[in-house]
Amino acid sequence: MPTQEGQPAPRPDEDARREFWTFHMERSAELLHAMQQQPTEECGEGFASIADAVAASDVEMWFSDSKIAGDLDRIFYIRETLIPDLLAIGADMNARGWILKIEDGYRTKQMQTELGRKPAVFDTIVRSCWWELGGEPPSLELIRRRSTCLVANFPNHGTHTMGAAVDVSVFLRDDGTEVSRGKPYLEMSELTPMDSPFVRTEAQQNRIDITTMMEAHGFLHYPGEFWHYNKGDALYHMVTKSGQVSPYGPVHWDQATNKVVAYDDVSLPLTPPELMGELLDQALTRLGLQSDSQ
């Protein structure tokens, strides 16, 4: 997405890209709103290490060595009963000549909160909104609405904090090159939605093939991100129309005891409106984004 300073010439299909991005963001907002209506009763199931499970198997799987937003350590854990499914996916990919790479797993409430506030992330959201509006400073209401989708500002939207989601990439076993999905993890643009029409045909097919292998073992794709898959949470049960109460809600996890405790209130935003307003003012100043008419 272009920035105000040193902005490249608009692409011939710039308006179409903006239109799709807005459509996608509103679609995601509606999906997450519907997710809130899905009944959830935390079952208390503990977590298991994905890396330990892989080490005890014959599956070749990789793990990200980067940090979240620069300095937050990743936690490669997921609900215990989901481990066999991930191993099966990894084995299927190995048989195809691929390697599944886990980019992210469980996130604590603190991690999810900090992620949404870090300048590296928040500035990207602000810049994307500025681009969406054709070069106008975004309102706080738009930033709040987009943050709900892009960084799960409400706990009952965050499947990572439920211990039910993984972010993934895929690589070739023979030479270690990435299986292209249009852009590498992590991307925030009109290429991010799983069904983006602005991704080349080969990358679109790779997205489809990876999703088919993930969903064969129950890990459903999130339409808003080509790397995100989840199972057993409210979004999963809503999409599959299971008719069941979701057993996984956002939880605090004690790694020493492997005990989980449900959040007290999943409907309160991690970053409240007044603080988000302050962050927006800081970001606009930091980025130098002003109306074209000024």
Regions found by a protein language model. Give the residues of each.
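Extracytoplasmic cell-surface/polysaccharide-interacting catalytic and binding patches
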Residues: 1-105, 109-223, 236-294
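Catalytic and binding regions of secreted/periplasmic enzymes and modules that target cell-wall glycans
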Residues: 226
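Conserved metal-phosphate-binding beta-hairpin within the catalytic cores
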Residues: 229
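Active-site beta-loop-alpha junctions enriched in small/polar residues
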Residues: 232
